[in-house]
Each structure stands twice: as C-alpha cells, then as structure tokens.
C-alpha cells in the first residue's frame, strides 16, 4: 500500500516542480517554455508501468501454492491500465488479468495467438470469465484458487478485461466518466489496446481474437469495427468468438415463445398463452414501425419477463407449495430453477466463491490493486448499464456483415439450454443478415457433427453441430447453458481449436464429423500428432476397442465373415492387438472398407515396404511348405531325375508367384494412392467452401403472432425439413425448427 502512495506522491511533487519552472521561465523564453512543456508531458507519461510491474506471483494467490503440478501454473500479469492521454491511473482505467501457458502444451499457432475475453451485462465483470469459465483458474467454496483443466490459456494467451469503465475493478473518477454509447466504449477499448501493447510489446505481432459472451455480442463487433477503422494502433485482428451473443435484442426477443414451446416450457393450451402472443405482436409491430433503427424496444424486452412470470410454479401438481428457490425457470439454463423474480440471477453456484476470493487479505495487492482506490468486487454494476443506453448506435447485427466481408472469422457458439440468447433466435438473426452477396447461410453451407474425444480413454462424446458459410461459423453446444465454458470447459476449447484449424475431420456413421480433444495438434506444436484416419463406429467408439468388439458381438456384427476377412488381412495387426490391447482402426478392413490414410509420402512408402515384406514372408512360408512336402515323400517313390525336375518346376513357380504378387501389390497401392490422395492430404481448413445463393426469408408481419397460435402444434412436432447433403441424413435447418440436436449421434 505504501508503494502506491510513495509513487503517486513522487509523481505529484515532480509535476508541481515542473509547473513552477515552466511558469518562471515562460516569462523569459518561448523555447525554454516549450522545452519544459515537453519535459512535463514526458514526466506524466511515465505513469505507464512496465510489464514486470504487472507480474503476479502464484504464491500470493490463495490455493496456488498448494498446486500439485507447479509446471501447470501459468504466468500471470494483472493490474490497471489507464485510458486517458496522460496515463493517469487515478482517473478512468481498465483492470486486466492475463494468463500465459508455461506447460509447453500449446501448439505453434496457439503460442502466436492473443485472446481478449469480455463478459457482458453490460457492466458485468470479466472476472466471471477468468475464474468461472475460460480462465486458467477456478475458485472453491473456501475462496481458494485451483487450476482449471479446461482453461483457454493453452490455446493462446488470454487477457480478461473489466470494461466499460466502472465495471468490476475498472474505475471512473466521477459519474460523468460513465459511457453512454457503444461508440464511446469502442474508443476507450482502442485506447486500452494502445497502452496494453506499449506495456506488452511482444504481443503486438500475435494474431488477435476478441472473445466473450452475452452482451459482448455488442461489444466485440463494435470494437472490431473501431480497430479496423483506425490506424493509430496496429492490431492483427483475425477472429471474433461470441458465445450466446446478444447481437440483435429485438429480433432475438421474437424467439422466446417459439423456443419455450419447443422445449416444453409452455403449451398452447396454457391460459396465459394468448397473453404472451399479444406481447409478441406488440414487439413485432415496433420492429415494423418507423422506429426500427432503435437499439432495443421495451415491448420486446417485456416478452421474456412475461414468460418467466406466467411459467412460475408456486404449487406442484399435488397442490403442495414449491420451495421459493425452485419457483422460477433459470433464464440462463432451462434445466435449473431459481427464486422469483431472480430467475437465474443467483446463478452460477460458484459465484459466491469469487467474492470470498477477492475478499481474502492480500489478494488485491497481489493483483496490483490499491484497496483504498478500488471498491469491493461486485459481479455487475448497475450504473454502467443505466448509463449505456446507446442513443447513437444500432444493434451489432448491422455491423457483422461488414466485418465478415472484411475477412474476419466470426464464430457464434451457443449453449443449447440457454433461454435469453437461445439457438433459435441467433440462427434467425443469421438468416436475416446479408453479406458476400447472399442472405443467411447459403445452400452450400457446410454442415458437421461435432464430438469431443476424452484424453483418458478416447471415448467420444457428442459436443454439438457446426455450420459454416462465408467466414461465419455457428456452433451449437450440447448440454450447455448461457455460459458455455462454465458447463463444458474442455468442450468449449473446441471453439478456439476450430479457429486454429486444430481439429480432426473424420467420418462417423457416414457423417462428416469434427473431433476436438484435450491435446493441441498444431503443426508446430509439441504435442504428438494424432491419426486422423481412424474410422469410428460403435456409437463413436474406436472400432478396435474391447467395448466396441463386445457391442458388435452382441449385435451379431462380428461373425464369421468379419473373422475370415480379418484372417486375410495383415497378421501383424493381430499381434499388435494382442500386445497393445488396441491399434489404429485404420489398419483393419471392415466389410471391404479401405484404410483411411492421410499421410501421402512416408506412409505410402512404408505401406509398399510392408507389402513387400508380406510377399517375402508368404514366399518363405510357401518354400517351407514345399520343402516339408518333399521331405515327407517316401524314398521308394522317387524316380530318377524326377527330383531335379520338381525342383526346377518349383523354382520357376516361386519366381512367377513372386512377380505376380509384386505386380498386383504395386497396382493396388498405386490405385489406392491416386484414388484417395486428394481426400487424405495433410489437414486442410475443414470449413472453406464458397457459398451459392439462398432466397431471403420473407419478413414477418404482425399476423405472425396469430399464425404461431394457430400452428403452435407445428413447433412441438415440426416436419422433417432436414437438408440432405452428401453423407448427411438428418441435419437441422432454420426452416425445420427442429430440436437442434442430431438424433442417434
């Protein structure tokens, strides 16, 4: 604490002395006055610290000193970065907490990536993200930190920023310093970036990603636009990752009722259903009005509030009183309940742990915060949201098309259990966006199943599905809430892996499937490269696993035909299976399927060598069999000259068989190479196909609410509108209003 006081007093004394000298000499010489003015500005600019002054010692963070593997503890930096031109840390400034992986597990592309994470609100602290979601740490009920195995810091350096000013540990000098519009917030974030890269110049050349969730769906596109429109700060911005984004408040509000009907939260028979439809109609009328350039309408915001009110359960089906903390649906996770009217505001359950952590003596000082200068940590600040009304800004959905056309990758990932920013609403916004000469996802949209592979047992778990078209990716994350990394931290890293092109593309049950896992597989990474050629079945399990074999046996799929086919294959595979318990599924032929092989060069040569070795082995075995036959012949039956004649005949036969085997092997290998070389070249960006046109969806009218009431049954039992494309059999589309879950994955 004395450090802060001493440093600030010193700065004030120096500034006062410089001002006195400036006043004295300005009467004598203009050049001297200018010189002192420059000295004064230099002195003031010295308030910007060096990087090592922001270093955070793990030993000062409760719990980290007891970490079992200290090598996994990341390098950390934290503190205030001022925003004003004079770098005065006692006016408006942003608080940041940066994590850098030191375990060596990050791939080459990951080591060259810098992620800025922003939470929403507006006015909610990004310490939510740092300590409950994608950050390197989690906090237990005792207020102590422990390592988050699913932290995104292994996919790139990640910086959590409290913004706008007044959020979390970021400060303002007075109420006049609160921002009232997204354009102003964007200017301040660019100022933060300018000073950040001065403090950390080594980060200046890295590819930059803006990531976040919820209201960050507004912040991130606006910040990206501001970065592209200025040339003061050189930022190598490459991608925007937005989780459950609030990108078009009005349009997304129209999908609360359809989503609630689809999920069974309310039915058309409910007495309150017509009341909700009336609110829906009011919102639609506002959108269709001349005021449609407004950022948001109160009539649209009311829909969710009314939905939560009418679905409140005070008594259960037996007439018993429902506990007060179970009466309302959690708007952030429909699987959970909360008290009314909180309806999710008391969630996540880890939230109280953060207050206990930041309240622990010494933690603020460890993060280079002055306890006399910052207030007690609060998750969200009402003043920030009350001031930020955006009178001069439109919703960010109007900005996204230009960013896509500028070449930025935009990835919208959505937890499928969220209500407030649900899948249906986000996909509806996409369907109305126009970019690259098309509207919405085109007919050439690329569709993928998405699974996660456990590093412990290689078990495959369905993670979601992916759509890509013209730089825009939509990812639905199964069994995830509004805060995807909170529920599924390990799975959520697949969002970054997809951007880094660090995924496997395989076929599972004839469907194009992206596999993400816990290991970085980048070309320049230290982690070993996993084999992409694995053919998976048995509900996503490795074909050669014991569990899969038992499953096949129970289904009658592992009968004599498979056995005979296996005996005709490479006998060395069987030996390896016995010794290792399992082997790459690509070595096994199943029902005539060919080995999926991605490695063209060395592996092809190796296959030819294996074929030749097998041929030699077969030839030697045949020689031994012939020798045995000769040796078993009774001596009395050998005629004169017959033995020499048989030897000559056998020698010629052996040579002919050898030549035929080599010729056939070479023909097969050559055919396989030219057939499959394009398919199994080294990994390509799986999501890079240009689109074709799709007709624009007709604009809804005020009659849509009545249509919804009349056709509500269609929402509960949608027709199969699945798009069949290549190996796909049942892929959801926006038109189908399906459950957004792929059956039988």
From Swiss-Prot:
Glycans are attached at residues 471, 479, 552. Residues 515-526, 538-549, 630-640, 735-745 have a biased composition (Basic and acidic residues). Its main location: Golgi. The keyword Transmembrane helix applies. GO terms for biological process: apoptotic process; proteolysis. The chain crosses the membrane at residues 656-676. Its EC number is 3.4.16.6. It holds the Pfam family Peptidase_S10. InterPro entries: AB_hydrolase_fold, Peptidase_S10. It catalyses: Preferential release of a C-terminal arginine or lysine residue. Residues 48-655 are lumenal. It is found in: Golgi apparatus, trans-Golgi network membrane. Residues 527-537, 570-579, 587-629 have a biased composition (Acidic residues). Residues 677-745 are cytoplasmic. Protease with a carboxypeptidase B-like function involved in the C-terminal processing of the lysine and arginine residues from protein precursors. Promotes cell fusion and is involved in the programmed cell death. This is Pheromone-processing carboxypeptidase KEX1. It comes from Lachancea thermotolerans (strain ATCC 56472 / CBS 6340 / NRRL Y-8284).
């Amino acid at each position: 604490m004395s450090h802060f006081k001493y440093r600030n007093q010193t700065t004030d004394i120096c500034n006062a002395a410089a001002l006195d000298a400036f006043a004295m000499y300005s009467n004598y010489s203009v050049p001297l006055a200018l010189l002192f003015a420059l000295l004064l500005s230099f002195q003031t600019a010295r308030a910007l610290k060096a990087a090592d002054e922001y270093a955070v010692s793990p030993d000062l963070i409760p719990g980290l000193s007891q970490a079992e593997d200290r090598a996994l503890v990341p390098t950390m930096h934290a503190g205030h970065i001022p925003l004003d031109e004079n770098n005065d840390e006692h006016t408006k400034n942003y608080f940041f907490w940066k994590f850098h992986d030191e375990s060596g597990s990050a791939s080459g592309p990951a080591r060259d990536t810098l992620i800025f994470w922003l939470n929403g609100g507006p006015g909610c602290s990004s310490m939510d993200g740092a300590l409950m979601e994608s950050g390197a740490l989690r906090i237990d009920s005792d207020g102590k930190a422990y390592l988050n195995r699913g932290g995104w810091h292994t996919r790139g350096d990640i910086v959590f920023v409290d913004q706008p000013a007044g959020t979390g540990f970021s400060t303002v000098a007075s109420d006049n310093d609160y921002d009232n519009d997204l354009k102003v917030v964007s200017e301040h974030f660019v100022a933060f970036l300018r000073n950040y890269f001065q403090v950390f110049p080594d980060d200046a050349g890295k590819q930059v990603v803006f990531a976040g969730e919820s209201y960050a769906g507004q912040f991130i596109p606006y910040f990206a636009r501001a970065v592209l429109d200025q040339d003061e700060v050189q930022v190598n911005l490459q991608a925007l990752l937005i989780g459950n984004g609030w990108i078009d408040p009005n349009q997304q509000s129209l999908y609360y009722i359809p989503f609630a009907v689809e999920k069974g939260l309310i039915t058309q028979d409910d007495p309150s259903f017509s009341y909700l439809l009336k609110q829906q109609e009011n919102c639609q009328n506002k959108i269709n009005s001349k005021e449609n350039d407004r950022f948001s309408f109160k009539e649209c915001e009311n829909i969710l509030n009314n939905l939560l009110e009418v679905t409140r359960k005070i008594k259960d089906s037996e007439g018993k009183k429902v506990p007060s903390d179970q009466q309302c649906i959690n708007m952030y996770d429909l699987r959970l309940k909360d008290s009314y009217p909180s309806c999710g505001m008391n969630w996540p359950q880890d939230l109280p742990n953060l207050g206990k952590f930041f309240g622990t003596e010494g933690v603020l000082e460890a993060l280079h915060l002055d306890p006399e200068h910052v207030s007690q940590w609060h998750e969200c600040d009402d003043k920030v949201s009350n001031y930020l009304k955006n009178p001069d800004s439109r919703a960010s959905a109007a900005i996204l098309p230009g960013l896509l056309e500028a070449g930025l990758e935009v990835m919208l990932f959505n937890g499928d259990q969220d209500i407030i920013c649900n899948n249906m609403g986000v996909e509806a916004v996409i369907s109305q966006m126009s970019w690259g000469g098309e509207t919405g996802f085109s007919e050439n949209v690329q569709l993928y199943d998405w699974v996660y592979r456990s590093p412990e047992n290689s078990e495959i778990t369905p993670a979601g599905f992916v759509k890509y078209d013209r730089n825009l990716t939509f990812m639905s994350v199964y069994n995830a809430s509004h805060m995807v990394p909170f529920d599924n931290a390990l799975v959520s890293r697949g969002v970054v892996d997809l951007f880094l092109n660090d995924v496997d593309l395989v076929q599972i049950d004839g469907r194009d499937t992206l596999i993400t896992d816990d290991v970085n597989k980048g070309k320049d990474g230290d982690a070993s490269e996993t084999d992409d050629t694995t053919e998976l079945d048995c509900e996503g399990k490795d074909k050669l696993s014991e569990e899969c074999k038992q499953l096949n046996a129970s289904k009658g799929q592992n009968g004599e035909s498979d056995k005979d086919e296996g005996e005709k294959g490479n006998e060395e595979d069987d030996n390896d299976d016995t010794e290792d318990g399992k082997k790459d599924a690509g070595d096994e032929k199943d029902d005539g399927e060919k080995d999926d092989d991605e490695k063209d060069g060395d592996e092809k040569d190796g296959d030819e060598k294996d074929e030749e070795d097998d041929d030699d082995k077969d030839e030697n075995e045949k020689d031994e069999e012939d020798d045995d036959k000769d040796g078993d012949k009774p001596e009395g039956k050998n005629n004169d000259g017959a033995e020499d004649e048989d030897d000559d005949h056998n020698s010629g036969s052996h040579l002919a068989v050898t030549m035929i085997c080599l010729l056939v092997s070479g023909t097969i290998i050559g055919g396989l190479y030219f057939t499959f070389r394009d398919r199994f070249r080294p990994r390509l960006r799986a999501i890079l196909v240009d689109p074709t046109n799709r007709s624009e969806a007709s604009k809804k009218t005020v009659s849509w609410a009545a249509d919804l009431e009349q056709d509500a049954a269609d929402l509960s039992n949608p027709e199969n509108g699945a798009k069949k494309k290549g190996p796909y059999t049942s892929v959801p589309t926006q038109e189908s209003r399906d459950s957004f879950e792929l059956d039988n994955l």
